[in-house]
């Protein structure tokens, strides 16, 4: 069986969700052993960091359509599928089909049914903390410190990945640490 970008993403998410691994450590290790193309590696990175970042929102979406708690592996797979459908802009047929392909024979029908429902229904969020996948206390703190519109805008902005820059020596850093590059020439890339 050939390795797919989603199978690598699922392997990383399983390590993160079930073994307590850190995404920034497990993902590079898995990618270094894979034979994926650069675009596929970027897609894996988006899936892993995005699914991890939006975990609470993905769980709220899944919980809307399941009657009993799925096993841990199935929950992780459903999160991956829900992230693709709701947040990553992946075409529904592609997200559902590719995610179901990763399911076990026993769970494939269940995963297919849940993700098809997710793909056709507009989510009604209980609150901004769930929609933006933050703990309640963070959302409450922001809403207590600024206007509701400013709080939501700040929380939304913090969910946007920082642009990445590469120095000519190959060092990669996010834009928030650009002050480090003040003494070393950097190119946006």
Question: What residue ranges belong to the model's regions?
Answer:
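Rossmann-like S-adenosyl-L-methionine
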Residues: 167-189
């Amino acid at each position: 069986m050939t390795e797919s970008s989603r199978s690598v993403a699922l392997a990383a998410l399983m390590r993160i969700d079930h073994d307590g691994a850190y995404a920034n450590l497990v993902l590079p290790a898995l990618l270094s052993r894979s034979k994926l193309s650069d675009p596929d590696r970027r897609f894996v990175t988006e899936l892993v960091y995005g699914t991890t970042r939006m975990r609470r929102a993905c769980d709220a979406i899944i919980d809307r359509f399941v009657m009993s708690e799925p096993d841990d592996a199935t929950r992780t797979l459903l999160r991956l599928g829900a992230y693709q459908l709701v947040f990553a802009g992946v075409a529904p047929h592609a997200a559902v089909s590719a995610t179901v392909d990763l399911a076990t024979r026993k769970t494939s029908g269940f995963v297919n049914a849940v993700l098809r429902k997710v793909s056709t229904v507009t989510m009604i969020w209980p609150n901004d903390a769930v929609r933006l996948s933050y703990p309640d206390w963070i959302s409450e703190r922001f809403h207590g410190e600024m206007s509701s519109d400013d709080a939501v805008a700040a929380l939304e902005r913090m969910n946007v990945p920082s642009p990445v820059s590469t120095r000519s020596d190959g060092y990669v850093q996010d834009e928030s640490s650009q002050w480090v590059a003040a003494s070393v020439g950097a190119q946006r890339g």
